[in-house]
Amino acid sequence: NHIISCGDLLNKFERQIVLEEDCFVSPNYYDFAFKSLTFYNTEKKVAGISLYSYLYYESFGTVFTPLIDGYDTYFMQVPSSLGQIWTKEQWFGFKAWYNTNPEIGENDKIPEKVKTWPENSWKKYFYKYMVENDLFFVYPHIAFTTNFGDTGTHFPEKTQIYQVNIEYYEKGKSYNFPQFANSNNKYDSYFEILPQCLIKRGLKIDPDTCIDIMGSKPLHLFTNIY
């Protein structure tokens, strides 16, 4: 697996930016990478930082729009594969888990389509790793990478579903990063906002509520009261 091999280069380095050949980057991607790494370097809940920003729930086929809360980033239990950043600690936390030869089964709380991905998909296992360990990726509200969806290994036909607007501010932007503990903008592996975030925003719901606005969750896997 190419990404596993790339991640293992962190044996020699402290931090890593992974860009596949079909990614197009913002001129400021490195500035964001440096500043976000500096800010989240010691946050134990963060499993990686994304340069991409999803507008499409890829494993279900619906539009996704995170809440705009005045910050430049939010958190999601979805691994990024269209431009991602890892520290040595983040990568080898995953790798130690991966080396136990985990299996993905029908009862795992990850999107159903993800479960059908090939066994050599690193992303499939990173999904499960994040859910099992309650970890999150940091995502920018405005992307620093995009993908043109040209025909190739992953796209048998040209597609535009991964094309997004990319950031193009003046250099030296001061980013407004939220602390994980204080953020009310966190999403689960099904691109659904966490109930505690809605409660903090004033919505009167039980903390043990299963949020399934897009209808992608196999509800028999969830034992929530609501």
Summary of predicted features, one role per range:
Residues 1-19, 23-226:
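Peripheral/terminal regions associated with large enzymatic or DNA-binding modules
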